[in-house]
Each structure stands twice: as structure tokens, then as C-alpha cells.
Amino acid sequence: MAVALETERVLSGYNEALSGAVVYRVPDPGYLRIAGADQIAFVQRQTTNDVQALASGRALLTVLTSPTARILDVWRLVVEPDGSLGAITLPGRGAATARFLQSHIFFMDKVTVTDASAAWAQVEVFGPAASSVLTQIGLAQAPAPDAIVSWDVGDVPVRAFGTGQGCLLLVSSEQIEGVEGRLNAVGAVPLSQEAYEVLRVEAGRPGPAHELTDEYTPLEADLDAAISDRKGCYTGQEVIARQITYDKVARRLAGLRLDALVTVGAAVQVEGRTVGAITSAVQSPRHGPIALAVIRRPHHAPGTAVAVADAAGAVSSVTVALPF
């Protein structure tokens, strides 16, 4: 009975995301404050995008990379009301990223890095009716992608970040329950993590525990939009510059339609040779068994027949363009 109820709950949230509006509480959210006279220069030399282009009222996507250009974290970077910088990190990365940045502050740097993750909750609101439910709790107009709008829900300050699929709300962790309650009251349905993962994979979005890791570079994980090819030096730039200039991105994120569900980490093969690995896999109510994989070029191209070497045996599959 419990398994059936759980399945029904997951499907209900999934269906509501396609036809109405859902609310998803981001687990273990991360938020950093970066302040000081050298805050821009400090972040500029650590991440991939041009931080000097950051403007008030806008968010900038940028990637913290290692010397070999592997992904350490992905941020939405914003200007705080007091002029400092705020960085929304990947879930679960706030504390580790704060320590990493603090260890990279030089003695002459006039900058501080504070882990403020515990103070802020993050909630995603999306679905065809998302704009309607947000309007009903006082938002005049949903923000465009990368735009930021601030307003009060009752006496609770809320910031909404446009994501393209809906909004990410940043709310005091002490007051989030009341805001979620208001959203539920006007028709936004809570979404489970299981349903969120299915929707994420269907949309072809890389996830923090799967594709956005130090196994991959930003270009391999479809983060081209977070890279500036006109800015000065930053950690990992030489590798990324070679990938761009000489078309040396050896692997790319791809979608797979499968004959059966497979496990994360299973090898993707062509004629018995491993060309990639499964990074996310779900059973979609709309599409059946599907997966995301990082696959060597040119085998990532849509329409390529591949086999997935799962524990139970080889599973036939074909690559598809994203989103599904």
C-alpha cells in the first residue's frame, strides 16, 4: 500500500508540473556572500564568465573550475542590495565551495567569503500555471530568464530569479514555510524529488550529483552559456580556450532512448568499444526509459545506435537531441 501511495504521489506531482504549477524545495541549498573592494577581481579570476558584465537586477551563470577545467561548482551570481556579491551554488556545495574560495584568497586580496547557506531557502516554482500562482501571491510579473524581481509575500521579502522554466525563489529559511503555504493555497502542488528528477532528465538539464561534477568540463556538460571567450585569465582557462579554439571538446551531453532502464555509471558502447557513461537514468511516464550520458564525439550525434553495458546485460539504445 505504501509503495502504491508513493507512486501515486510522485505521478500526481509529475502530471501537475505538465498541466499546472508545482513547488519544489531545493535540498541542501547553498548561498555565499562575497564582499570587499576586490570582490569582482577575485571572482573574475576563479570562474568562467565575465563577472564585470554583472548588473543589478540580473543573474549571471558562471562556473568555478579546477586548473584542468573540471567543474567544481556552478553559480547564479547576483549583486546584493549592499553592493556585495551573492552566489547561489549547486545543492550541497555551499560549505565546500566557501572553504575552497577562502583558501584561494591571497594576502593582498581585499575580499571576504561567507557561507550564508543556512540563512536562505530556495524553492523552484514552475509549470504552465506558474505565472498565475505567483501573481496570486503578489508578484506583478514573472521575471524573464536571468532577471531578478523582489517583492513581499505578506511581510516576507522574496527574490525571484527567472530560470526559463519558471522561477527560483530565495526566501529566509525561517520564513519559507509561510511562503510555501501561500503557494499551496493558490494551487501550486508540492513536487517530490523523484518527480523532479524525471522532469529534469526529460528537459535534458545536467544535475548537480550527475553531470555537474569534476568528471566533466563545462563544455562537456552543456554549460556553453556560462563561458566568456573574451575575458582575462581564470583558473582552467587554457583548457577551455583550447577546447573552443581547436574544437577539442571530446565529449558531449546526449539523451538516450533505451529499451530498458539502466543504472547510472553503466558504459555506453559502440561496436564493443566504450564511448561514454550513463550519468542520469529515469523511467519517464511519457517517454519510457530514458537517460542522459556524456559520450565521445561523434557518437553523441542524434540517431546514433549505441549499447549500454548494464549489469543485467547489453541494452539497446539510440541517441536523441535534448530535450526529449
Regions flagged by a language model, labelled:
Residues V22-Y24, G30-Y31, D73-P206:
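Acidic, low-complexity central loop/insert segments
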Residues Y216, A221-Q237, A241-F324:
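Glycine-rich, small/acidic residue-mixed loop/short-helix segments
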